[in-house]
Swiss-Prot record:
One of its GO terms (cellular component) is cytosol. Belongs to the DMRL synthase family. This is 6,7-dimethyl-8-ribityllumazine synthase. It comes from Porphyromonas gingivalis (strain ATCC BAA-308 / W83). The active site is at H97. One of its GO terms (molecular function) is 6,7-dimethyl-8-ribityllumazine synthase activity. Gene3D superfamilies: Lumazine/riboflavin synthase. Its EC number is 2.5.1.78. 5-amino-6-(D-ribitylamino)uracil binds at W31, T65, F66, E67, C89, V90, V91, F122.
Length: 161
């Protein structure tokens, strides 16, 4: 979580396993694309930096954050990936829609992690304002996509222990 004391893009480089032989899926919501595209770029750049081949990064765009659960399951089952990163952004509005979407995608991704054998990483920003999202998509709090990619590499490495 980004706070005044922690930047999402700060991590111990040496603690991240090499991704040379890994295949990573990335499910990306198109909604709030001005946020999700920089998140995706942060994830891809980090994966490449840690040895994942560009050919082994499979990106699937979906209309919105709610669809990330389905896309993540699809990537895990159809593309034989070692981990999936779900990237989305939900900003609170004037209706309860925010709560329904956040709860649905959180429960969906949790269920995929319980039922499946491919780790699905929660790279979804749930913010009160667009400014908060921007600050976590490459702004002053770093990039949640970078954090999600590091988590994916570490979780994919669990299978190799």
């Amino acid at each position: 979580m980004a706070t005044a004391y922690h930047n999402l893009s700060d991590y111990d480089y040496e603690s991240v396993p090499c991704g040379k032989d890994l295949r990573i899926g990335i499910a990306v919501a198109e909604w709030n694309h001005n946020i999700t595209e920089p998140l995706m770029k942060g994830a891809i750049d980090t994966l490449l930096e840690h040895g994942v081949s560009a050919d082994n990064i499979i990106v699937q765009h979906v209309p919105g954050t709610f669809e990330l659960t389905y896309a993540s399951a699809y990537l895990a089952e159809q593309h034989e990936v070692d981990a999936v990163i779900a990237i989305g952004c939900v900003v609170r509005g004037d209706t309860p829609h925010f709560d329904y979407i956040c709860q649905g995608v959180t429960q969906g991704i949790t269920q995929l992690n319980i039922d499946g054998f491919v780790p699905v990483i929660f790279g979804v920003l749930t913010t009160e304002t667009m400014l908060q999202a921007e600050e976590r998509a490459g702004g002053k709090h770093g990039n949640k996509g970078t954090e999600a990619a590091v988590t994916a590499l570490k979780m994919a490495g669990l299978e190799r222990i």
